[in-house]
Amino acid sequence: MSLFDIEDIKVKPDIVCTYPDPTVPPDAAIVIDNGSYHCRAGWAGKDVPSLVFKNVLAKPRKDRSKKDTSEVVVPTVQIGNDITNIEAVRFQLRTQFDRNVVTHLHVQEQIFDYLFGRLGINADGCVPHPVLLTECVANPNYSRMLMSELMFECYGIPGIVYAVDGLLSYRMNGGQDSGLIVSCGYQATHVIPVLNGRMVEDKVRRINLGGFNMINFMFRLLQLKYPVHVNAITLSRAETMIHNYCSFAYDYTESLRNWALLEFYEQNVIKIQLPYNQNVSAPTLTAEQRLEKRKELSRRLAEINLRKREEKLAEDKVLLTRMLAAEDTLDDEDNVGFTLHEFSVKNVDEYRKMIVTLRERIAKTTQKMNSQQTNNQPEEKPLQLLQPPPNMTIEEWVIETRRKRDEILDKKQIRKQRKQDLAKRRTAAAQERMRIISHLAKKEKGVDDFGMRDEDWDVYKSISREGDSDSDAENEKLIECEEILKQHDSTFVEPVVAPGNIAEFHQLHIGVERIRVPEILFQPSMIGVQEAGLTGTIDYVLKLFPKEDQVKLVGNVMLTGGCANIRGFKERLSRELQAILPFQSVYNLMVAGSPSLDAWRGASQFANSQEFKQSLITRQLYDECGGEYFKEHTASNFYYPTPSQVSSALNDTFN
């Protein structure tokens, strides 16, 4: 059992890099790994990217209250690491991706502006460097065409090369001519077969699951488990928990059985301490202090009542003076109706009766106020102190009361400990319970007289899991003892709630969720996705090839992508491969050296190769052949021309 403080992701805004970079050639290419989770950008030939940031932007909504002002206010757009608190702008986040395909080019343009600006490129209206840009497997021609149009028309780049991130990572890790790539991304997971140095694109398969689904699953599980802490459980914190504490189970079914055991749970559960404000408890008041406090409250209440009486008395006197002054008009028939209406009475008799009532009320209130002034102290009921029996002194009575209280607390603690012991399998209490049960079961069948004797109740209590419960009489006796000690024992301290209990209330227990969340990659049905898991997809892809090619593929299986960082992935997939391959098959499984970063590193190496120069789509080719023109290479998608009917329909739609 381990306790950890919650870790909130803290990012620092990116600085503007020096341009031109003295460590790279003047014509060096810009390498951009445009992932749906992180964007990594830097110069070709370097080992690490210059920029790594979340591939999102936050655009605040316009303030509608200022729509009538003549001054145009443009909301500030935050991009990448400029978003220091992503949860504060969660509902304002925008991304250029629809799953893993770039579809929102206006968002992509703003992110590229941020990227080139942070790289320090300050050329006049253009980016004078070729670009290597990653794209998803089987990226649609139309999406690539819009990206080329953005790059050439908006940024004026001299050339661009498109490559698949999984193939670049495979290349970085010394990929052989044949192998099987399992690329686990943020939005999707791809199984990519490679034969003779090229991807077999028509046999690639995709699972619509990735890191995003794991984060969302953990987020919903914890909110369902701890509804009282629903505001403290955020997507960012769920993401951190997956990175730090989750792992793939080698045998998921067996792991579930282990987590059902209390001992295993207590040894392996992760406790996450949420932030909370600890209220400082007020000091315990003595009997004299409580009495003084009651007197003070009574005095304040008396002052409030006196003030109300004075206000009411003044109102009554003013009303009586007005009525006496208007009494002479009652004999005038012309004014009597107006006078009665003014004082809301029906006739003259009711008017005179109201005057008598006011005089009596004024006299009574004045008399009560005079009596209070003579005796300012309100009458207090004496504090009823509990007294000892006639045959005991107070000191003896306090000692005896303390002893009784300790006995009651000891009994309650013994019952609590016994319940905990019975919950475990190998404790002495649990073994004694099983011995008694087995002894009772050995008795011959006949007349069941268990319970006829008083001793049977003791046997029942000894084998009952619940044990004795705290009786009401016992609790009342405990309260009485504590009240006596409060009044007569100056050393007695009233028990208060320990701060540790408050801290435990603000803890999250990450138990079976540690293996349950990553398991969705192998069992998508756990979150309602009707697709095959990773094992079934790999098995399906392998069966698309003849046996001799299957041997080549399983001889070099590589895991890459952010999800490959989760512990136990290699061991679990190795077990699954052993189950689906023929008996005594030989296979080799490896994890990329840096699953998250190797795609950019492979792109950095590729951008320095001769193949990059041969695969470059230049501005001249773009102008001559159009935005759909594409050059294939060993780390790229295959080019399939868009049918003419579809092309004409797209042109009619967007022209």
UniProtKB/Swiss-Prot annotation:
Keywords assigned: Coiled coil, DNA damage, DNA recombination, DNA repair, Nucleus, Transcription, Transcription regulation
Protein localization: Nucleus
Gene3D superfamilies assigned: 3.30.420.40, Actin, Chain A, domain 4
One BP annotation, GO: chromatin remodeling
Cellular component, GO, one term: nucleus
SUPFAM superfamilies: Actin-like ATPase domain
Chain positions covered by the region annotation Disordered: 368-387
Coiled-coil region list: 287-314, 346-377
Ribonucleoprotein as UniProt keyword: no
Assembly and binders: Component of the chromatin remodeling Ino80 complex.
Family: Belongs to the actin family. ARP5 subfamily.
Role, per record: Proposed core component of the chromatin remodeling Ino80 complex which is involved in transcriptional regulation, DNA replication and probably DNA repair.
Protein name (record): Actin-related protein 5
Name of the gene: Arp5
